[in-house]
Amino acid sequence: MEAFARSERSFEEVMRFYLEMRWMMSNQYTMKIYPAGSGRDVYRNIEICCNSTLNQLCQIILESFDFIDEHMYEFCMDNRMYSEYAYQSDPEGDEPSADITLDEVGLCKGQKFALHYDFMDDWMFTITVSKISEVQGDLKPCIVKAKGSIQQYPD
């Protein structure tokens, strides 16, 4: 009977360890970003953690294309500018804010949405969630692959 009690304790310890490890796991999104009008010659692949916000996603996208972050933007979940299904960088009233985590948005593999940046120049970036992986801890956003370039302010 004593051996059985020890094995139960051992099972409980294993389960507690497993649950603690699961608690420390989080989703990491791999995304492919294309600027509109550039075809398939210009894109970026980025990885970003589920606890990052849409604001942080915008920052890494702009950084990856060497853009200066100095304008308002919105994430268009239906790929249309000024849509009611958008998260705003500077919301008015009860509009949804881009200060929401990626997990709260509820992204899924294969989902496409857009970043509309600079409402005067109307930069559009198509974002595709290409992969969702489980990782341990929160990783910083990073640029995994870059192809081609564009200029924010062409001559």
Q: What is each stretch, according to the model?
A:
Residues 1-155:
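Short linear regulatory motifs enriched in tryptophan with gly/pro/ser
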